């Protein structure tokens, strides 16, 4: 027989709420109606939720890495992001318009959704809690440098900061600057450097850690 014992005071127990929130009740009501009217099945809803929960920033990182190594692709990406993403066999999501915006040495772009949490989930996965917070949504527009500073990013005074407000009809993907020291890296290795936050614009992509010279350290 399996046992599941707890030592006294081992950890704080999880306390479930007895009542659903307003939005949870509304979600369940809509889901029940969709199933009842035969528009969707419970399994189709479950599979869609599972698919959304499984999305990660990996696809977005692939797009960025390709743009870094292929100038022609980057030009197409900046011109028509949805079409360029489709070239890689990737899904850019349900939003009618996806816009790629490039960070440079003189221009730094930041994305926010001032109304809710609109976000290119198909490429970046679920939005982080801070992206959905009122603090970020309200301050990113009026004090972007201050917000970036809180993420540890201090920009030079001569760098222009542009803030893009995402919406249900238009999502944005930041193409961060390629960091120095990556000239000999493969496309797959470059993708491994790209983070979710850099594709939102609140951080830069860091240069890879220097690798030790094994030949130099080997005994003669």
Residues covered by each model-derived region:
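Terminal, compositionally biased segments used for targeting/anchoring and flexible tails
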Residues: 2-220
């Amino acid at each position: 027989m399996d046992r599941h014992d707890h030592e006294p005071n081992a950890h704080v127990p999880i306390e479930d709420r007895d009542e659903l929130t307003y939005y949870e009740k509304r979600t369940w009501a809509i889901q029940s109606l969709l199933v009842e009217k035969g528009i969707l099945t419970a399994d189709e809803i479950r599979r869609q939720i599972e698919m959304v929960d499984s999305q990660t920033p990996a696809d977005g990182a692939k797009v960025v890495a390709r743009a870094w190594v292929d100038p022609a692709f980057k030009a197409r990406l900046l011109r028509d992001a949805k079409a360029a993403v489709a070239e890689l066999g990737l899904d850019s999501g349900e939003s009618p318009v996806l816009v790629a915006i490039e960070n440079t040495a003189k221009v730094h772009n930041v994305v926010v959704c001032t109304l809710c949490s609109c976000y290119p989930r198909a490429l970046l996965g679920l939005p982080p809690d801070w992206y959905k917070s009122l603090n970020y949504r309200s301050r990113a527009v009026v004090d972007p440098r201050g917000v970036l500073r809180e993420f540890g990013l201090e920009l030079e005074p001569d760098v222009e900061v542009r803030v893009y407000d995402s919406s249900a009809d238009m999502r944005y993907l930041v193409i961060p600057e390629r960091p120095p020291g990556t000239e000999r890296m493969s496309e797959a290795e470059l993708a491994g450097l790209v983070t979710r936050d850099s594709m939102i614009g609140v951080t830069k992509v860091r240069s890879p850690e220097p690798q030790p010279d094994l030949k130099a350290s080997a005994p003669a």
